[in-house]
Amino acid sequence: MLTPTDAPACDAIVASLPYFFGDPAGVRDCAAAVRWQRGYVATADGDVAAFLTVERHNPESAEITWMAAHASQRRHGLGRRLIEHAAAELAREGVRMLCVLTLGPSVPEEAGDNYSGTRAFYASCGFVPLRELELRSWNDAYALMLVRAIGAPRTR
């Protein structure tokens, strides 16, 4: 579980990824999220190496609001483990749908195709694209909403 004492390590993770976290407002929003939202951390050699924050929008759905692994720890399975842990815990609480937003395919790549890799990562974790949204809070960029069923279907 992410605790307030993990926040500086999460800030350092964000600082290690300037090609993903280049917008100062986004960096500030992420810093606030790791201090106030529910979240999870993964460690490597005893240090926080990755984090994920979630927000519950209603009793049956949640959103991954921020997720990152330190540049030196990317592609080691930490992100996948964080998603699976969060999904299992949320499902036990009755959440049935998990969503995440990332830059959509309509956004021109400026950083070496980083976000196509992000979209592929989420697809490999069972997320499917739902729709692209133009978000004013993202400087009018197009965000792709991806969703994944995680809990048991509701019975009537």
State what each model feature region is.
Residues 41, 47-55, 63-68:
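Conserved beta-strand in the GNAT
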Residues 115-118, 132-142:
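Short glycine/proline-centered loop/turn elements that form peptide/ligand docking sites
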Residues 56-67, 74, 93-97, 138:
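A conserved beta-turn-beta hairpin within the catalytic core of GNAT-like acetyltransferases
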Residues 122, 127:
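Conserved active-site tyrosine of GNAT-family acetyltransferases
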